[in-house]
């Protein structure tokens, strides 16, 4: 609503006594808002509290409406340019709060400066123009006049006290001399007693006078040292109860405040508690710890209480911390199967060693164990020896290949009967090659605007902290306990992912170089300990072989493709040259039994001929370097029937690796529960059996990836920020739901699939286990399988570990409850929409 016209003549002589009333109101307000005043004032604070209540409710009485709050001045009373905008030039936010345009408001402010209103009710408007404020010199005259008035009042008070004392003495004397029974006690006081009473009275009066002087002195000192943030300067303050309508809440420059030691005021503003205003409120509510006659001279009770509480807290910490450390150490020495990661890395094998044992040129590098996040089970004796240009630092010089995972499998030092006994293995996805849906916690803290979608962007964003962050992940996400559990689950092979930056980085690569190599070597030693054989699988190749996030960099395919396609081709061969020389050592011949070339090259986009030529060259290279393991190549997402005629003149000991999922195929994800099991046992069973044959198909074939997930609901599964086919949010242009009840209802939801496993019904668990066991049965018609993946942070249907521990995976992988050919069980009342 527009303001009324502001005219001096409208109020006639109302200003004639304004100055006198201002002096009284100003002094009264000083008393009522004194920071250290312990009196129970009930005048202006109640108005302020009511006003704050109206503000919270979005309403202020029209006559008191204000659009601005804090207005701050420095200690000298000058406007602080860092804290305040020009009140005559409000910022965009302030201007938008008005109901009319800026030019109209500017004109109205001009009229206000020319003819300011003198109404008491609108005194805030009188102060809008800078020219309307009292000058500093005028305020000095007011202070002088205030001082004279204050001294006069003190003299009058002292005179009144003297008259009261004299009257008291005369009354006591008359009562003592009177014989009237109403003025007499049983025994009249003696002269000595009267003298003592008089002396006591005089002593009490002196104490009161001294307290009054001390209080006045303290008040003068407080007025001189009044804080800028706590209260405005007197020089430019508004009249009592008034403030400027056009003032916005000031921006607090925190740096300046902290430099001046005023951080407590910052806390008051941020949290809305404490400070002079709240202290006054506490006094009014009877919560103030001071006393009425302590005049603010002593430490308030609430401050003493704070220090008492702090002391008690310190005492508790002194007792609790040593106990917690002891308990923590005991816990660290016991692997917790439910959460084997622990809270701190182990470095006990550095005890008693000197950092000087590391040559100066190696200190601070990846060869320096004092820089490692975790040294558990690493050999920390320094060596700069390499094989194929790759460091052996961390390895022990001896090894033992006598272990076996179970009685159905030969020990490592005996050949595995590939072709007659299926592989039953698991992947370590998302560990040494980061994948967002497996470890979403590494990506959750970034907004979609930041574009952190893969290991490339994550490493680039982390910058200098990338090495520490990712090494912590390497050290804690997969530990020795995981390999023990893999063995106990009846598994016998592990497919370990790594990427080229474990070996080398190029150009502007932001990846953390070489650290994951050390954890790859330790993982192989853990596999050795538990009798598990290893398939090596490079998930990230220079340039990216598919443009997906698990290749390291989502986007363009730069391997065998584009401007740097040939360069990255040669780089990928150089990586295999180094890696194959390293794993051709005798210590790995019994354990690294399958050597992968590249994970999921997207042959639907790449030249098939170029990929096959590279595959042949890479296979010959690694075999020339001494690799005797089977060499695995991926089907490139081509129809398996096409592979019947491809690479017929290939090198020996090669395996075809196929990855099978129902959830990424819109024709399969919408099948109901029973139909999915039938699809596996009919179509997939025969497909794998056929391609695995050297006479009717390609030859030895493994399924390197599959899962029991029957939806694509897992967070980040379809890329960071992408929706799902199941709920119809995957495509930006198509909202079709691909689920069994999409046409009939109810609509499918990811809530049940993504729920905590403790909420899974018995029927749902039965389906998930049957669905998994059907796939095991189908893939075992070939060379066997590797489940994707062993562990995830939250995607339960992708974690063999979670399913195994929660009863929807067979207790032993080699002893399933269901096989293709068995009758598909009844899944009870399991709804089809999840």
UniProtKB/Swiss-Prot annotation:
It is a single-pass type II membrane protein. Residues 1-306 are cytoplasmic. Its EC number is 3.2.1.58. Residues 34-45 have a biased composition (Acidic residues). The chain crosses the membrane at residues 307-327. Residues 1-33, 46-76, 98-173, 201-218, 228-245 have a biased composition (Basic and acidic residues). GO terms for molecular function: glucan exo-1,3-beta-glucosidase activity. It is found in: Cell membrane. Keywords: Carbohydrate metabolism, Cell membrane, Cell wall biogenesis/degradation, Glycoprotein, Glycosidase, Hydrolase, Membrane, Polysaccharide degradation, Signal-anchor, Transmembrane, Transmembrane helix. Glycans are attached at residues 333, 379, 384, 396, 549, 561, 570, 639, 672, 692. Residues 1-188, 200-251, 331-354 are annotated as: Disordered. One of its GO terms (biological process) is cell wall organization. It catalyses: Successive hydrolysis of beta-D-glucose units from the non-reducing ends of (1->3)-beta-D-glucans, releasing alpha-glucose. InterPro entries: Glyco_hydro_5, Glycoside_hydrolase_SF, Glycosyl_hydrolase_5. One of its GO terms (cellular component) is plasma membrane. It is an enzyme of class 3 (hydrolase). The active site is at 600 (proton donor), 705 (nucleophile). Its main location: membrane. It comes from the Eukaryota. Glucosidase involved in the degradation of cellulosic biomass. Active on lichenan. PANTHER family: GLUCAN 1,3-BETA-GLUCOSIDASE 2, GLUCAN ENDO-1,6-BETA-GLUCOSIDASE B. This is Probable glucan 1,3-beta-glucosidase D.
């Amino acid at each position: 609503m527009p303001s009324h016209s502001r005219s001096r003549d409208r109020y006639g002589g109302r200003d004639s006594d304004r100055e006198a009333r201002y002096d009284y109101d100003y002094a009264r307000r000083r008393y009522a808002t004194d920071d250290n005043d312990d009196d129970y004032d009930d005048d202006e604070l109640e108005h302020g509290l009511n006003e704050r209540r109206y503000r919270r409710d979005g309403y202020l009485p029209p006559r008191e409406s204000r659009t601005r709050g804090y207005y701050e001045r420095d200690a000298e009373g000058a406007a602080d340019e860092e804290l305040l905008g020009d009140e005559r030039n409000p910022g965009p936010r302030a201007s938008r709060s008005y109901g009319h345009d800026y030019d109209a408001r500017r004109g109205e402010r001009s009229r206000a400066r020319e003819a300011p209103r003198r109404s008491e009710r609108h005194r805030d408007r009188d102060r809008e123009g800078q020219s309307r404020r009292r000058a500093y010199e005028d305020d000095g005259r007011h202070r002088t006049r205030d001082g004279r008035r204050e001294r006069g009042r003190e003299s009058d008070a002292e005179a009144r006290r003297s008259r009261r004392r004299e009257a008291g003495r005369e009354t006591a004397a008359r009562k003592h001399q009177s014989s009237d029974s109403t003025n007499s006690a049983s025994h009249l006081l003696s002269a000595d007693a009267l003298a003592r009473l008089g002396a006591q009275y005089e002593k009490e009066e002196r104490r009161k006078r001294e307290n009054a002087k001390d209080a006045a002195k303290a008040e003068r000192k407080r007025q001189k040292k009044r804080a800028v943030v706590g209260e405005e300067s007197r020089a430019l303050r508004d009249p009592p109860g008034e403030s400027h309508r056009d003032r916005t809440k000031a921006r607090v420059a925190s740096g300046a405040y902290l430099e001046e030691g005023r951080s407590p005021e910052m806390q008051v503003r941020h949290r809305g508690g404490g400070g002079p205003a709240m202290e006054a409120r506490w006094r009014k509510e009877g919560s103030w710890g001071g006393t009425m006659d302590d005049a603010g001279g002593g430490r308030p009770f609430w401050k003493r209480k704070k220090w008492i509480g702090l002391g008690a807290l310190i005492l508790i910490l002194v007792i609790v911390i040593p106990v917690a450390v002891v308990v923590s150490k005991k816990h660290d020495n016991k692997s917790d199967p439910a959460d084997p990661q622990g809270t701190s890395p182990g470095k006990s094998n550095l005890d008693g060693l000197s950092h000087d044992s590391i040559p100066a040129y190696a200190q601070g590098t990846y060869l320096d164990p004092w820089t490692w996040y975790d040294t558990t089970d690493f050999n920390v004796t320094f060596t700069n020896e390499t094989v194929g240009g790759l460091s052996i630092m961390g390895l022990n010089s001896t090894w033992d290949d006598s272990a076996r995972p179970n009685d159905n499998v030969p020990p490592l030092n005996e050949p595995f009967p590939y072709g007659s006994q299926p592989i039953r293995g698991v992947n370590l996805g998302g560990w040494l090659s980061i994948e967002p849906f497996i470890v979403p916690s590494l990506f959750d803290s970034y907004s979609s605007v930041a574009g952190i979608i893969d290991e490339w962007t994550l490493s680039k964003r982390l910058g200098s902290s990338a090495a520490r962050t990712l090494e912590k992940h390497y050290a804690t996400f997969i530990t020795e306990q995981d390999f023990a559990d893999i063995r106990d689950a009846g598994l016998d092979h592990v497919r370990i992912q790594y990427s080229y930056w474990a070996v080398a980085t190029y150009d502007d690569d932001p990846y953390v170089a070489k650290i994951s190599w050390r954890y790859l070597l330790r993982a192989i030693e853990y596999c050795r300990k538990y009798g598990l054989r290893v398939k090596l699988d490079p998930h990230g190749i220079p340039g990216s072989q598919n443009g997906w996030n698990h290749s390291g960099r989502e986007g363009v395919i730069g391997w065998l493709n584009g401007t740097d396609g040939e360069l990255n081709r040669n780089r990928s061969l150089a990586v295999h040259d180094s890696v194959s020389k390293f794993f051709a050592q005798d210590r790995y011949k019994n354990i690294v039994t399958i050597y992968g070339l590249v994970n999921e090259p997207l042959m639907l986009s790449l030249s098939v001929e170029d990929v096959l030529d590279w595959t042949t060259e890479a296979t010959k290279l690694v075999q020339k370097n001494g690799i005797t393991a089977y060499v695995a190549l991926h089907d490139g997402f081509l129809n398996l029937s096409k592979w019947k005629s491809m690479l017929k003149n290939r090198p020996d000991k090669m395996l075809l690796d196929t990855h099978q999922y129902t959830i990424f195929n819109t024709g399969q994800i919408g099948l109901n529960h029973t139909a999915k099991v039938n699809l596996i046992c009919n179509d997939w069973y025969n497909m794998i059996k056929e391609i695995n044959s050297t006479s009717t198909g390609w030859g030895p074939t493994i399924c390197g990836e599959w899962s029991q997930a029957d939806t694509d609901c897992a967070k980040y599964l379809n890329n960071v920020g992408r929706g799902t086919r199941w709920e119809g949010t995957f495509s930006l242009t198509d909202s079709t739901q691909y689920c069994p009840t999409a046409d009939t209802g109810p609509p499918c939801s990811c809530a049940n699939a993504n729920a905590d496993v403790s909420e899974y019904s018995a029927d749902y668990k039965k389906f998930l286990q049957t669905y998994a066991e059907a796939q095991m049965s189908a893939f075992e018609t070939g060379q066997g399988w590797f489940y994707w993946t062993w562990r995830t942070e939250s995607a339960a249907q992708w974690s063999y570990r979670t399913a195994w521990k929660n009863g929807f995976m067979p207790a032993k992988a080699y002893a399933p409850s269901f096989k293709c050919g068995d009758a598909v069980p009844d899944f009870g009342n399991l709804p089809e929409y999840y």
